[in-house]
Amino acid sequence: SKAIWGGLSYFLLPTSFCFRIFAAMMSDCSDKELELLQIIGSCAQKLNVPCYLVGGFVRDKLLQRGCKDLDFVCVGDGIALAHEVAKQFKPQPPVSYFKNFGTANIKHNEFEIEFVGARKESYASHSRKPEVESGTLEDDQKRRDFTINALAISLQKDDFGQLIDPFDGVNDLEAKIIRT
């Protein structure tokens, strides 16, 4: 079924379908990957920052491919979440951050982890440089390049693992289509 959220049609996948997708995706995750997702979800909950696994990792796991780059969108301060997550690792890795863009990176074992605050981008007619402001998950998904990179998995306690697919990216993956 479809729902309208902020003027955008979202495909709300039936719970049983979402569970199958999540189960298939998680069965392909290593113990280290699952532990990492649980740590990040717990830290996000502690900071009261909704957090979503997005982009290439979600896409690649659905395709049963390996991926060591994990991207997280936070509806709130992604840099603060990165610092909180880094505290959970021994030894504690440094956090590289770019305050102007609200992004932070951690290298932990073989993983490259990026946190970004959800953002909205707009462009002036005379510029290719975006004007950036804080946004919602929906805003962040709208700015993504391809439908398959707008896929998101919730890390919230109440709906952990819920797939959010606003642009029908799962069907595009199955059809082997790259669509903007």
Write out the residue ranges for each language-model feature.
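Compositionally biased, intrinsically disordered low-complexity segments enriched in Pro/Arg/Gln/His
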Residues: 12-13
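Catalytic cores of the polymerase beta-like nucleotidyltransferase superfamily
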Residues: 20-180
